[in-house]
Amino acid sequence: MISYDKLWVTMEEKGINYYQLTTKYGVSKSLLSRMKKGNWVSTHSLNMLCNILDCNLEDIATFTKDEQ
């Protein structure tokens, strides 16, 4: 399972809020909603967020192996 909980922490650390991502940087509200729910997002979107936040992927996402 991929979790994007670290995204919100990184945003705070970088001084960028939800409103700025959507208005200044053009990140769609639906993308942020999908991430908040833990749903699928494209690698393009992850790359875009890493560039905006000037961070690495591990700063916005974590992988946890699903229990079988």
Q: What role is predicted for each listed range?
A:
Residues 9-13, 34, 61-68:
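Short, charged recognition helix plus adjacent turn
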Residues 1-20:
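A short, Lys/Arg-rich alpha-helix, primarily the initiator
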Residues 28, 39, 64-67:
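The DNA-recognition helices of helix-turn-helix-type DNA-binding domains
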Residues 15-33:
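Short alpha-helical DNA-recognition segment
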Residues 12, 23, 51:
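Alpha-helical residues within the helix-turn-helix
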Residues 38-51:
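Short, basic-rich loop-to-helix N-cap that marks the start of a DNA-contacting helix
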Residues 31-34, 45, 59:
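Residue-level recognition of specific faces of alpha-helices
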